[in-house]
Amino acid sequence: MRLFISLPVLIVVLAMALEGPAPAQATPDLSSTFENLPDKLKEFGNTLEDKARAAIEHIKQKEFLTKTRTWISETFGKMKEKIKTTFT
């Protein structure tokens, strides 16, 4: 019984292995890869730009980060004034 079931399975597996890759799975030739390269790079650049802008806007809108940035600016300004008055 086991041999009766395993032989058709083995035949199907061998047929699939010997058939090779499907046309959609075949690797593209080098020239078509180079033809599509500028479009892919432009798409990648646009996606990266959009994500970077969204991240920067998200950081700018965070209340904690806004307060921290303000505090650092004020502290730096105070230090600058203190150094200016000390060495003048």
From Swiss-Prot:
Keywords associated with the record: Lipid transport, Secreted, Signal, Transport, VLDL
Gene Ontology MF: a single term: phospholipase inhibitor activity
InterPro entries: ApoC-1_sf (IPR043081), ApoC-I (IPR006781)
Signal peptide positions (record): 1-26
Single biological process term from Gene Ontology: triglyceride metabolic process
Gene3D superfamilies membership: Apolipoprotein C-I
Any Pfam family: ApoC-I
Places the protein is found: Secreted
GO cellular component terms listed in the entry, alphabetical order: high-density lipoprotein particle; very-low-density lipoprotein particle
Main location per the UniProt record: secreted
Role description: Inhibitor of lipoprotein binding to the low density lipoprotein (LDL) receptor, LDL receptor-related protein, and very low density lipoprotein (VLDL) receptor. Associates with high density lipoproteins (HDL) and the triacylglycerol-rich lipoproteins in the plasma and makes up about 10% of the protein of the VLDL and 2% of that of HDL. Appears to interfere directly with fatty acid uptake and is also the major plasma inhibitor of cholesteryl ester transfer protein (CETP).
Family: Belongs to the apolipoprotein C1 family.
Name of the protein described by the UniProt record: Apolipoprotein C-I
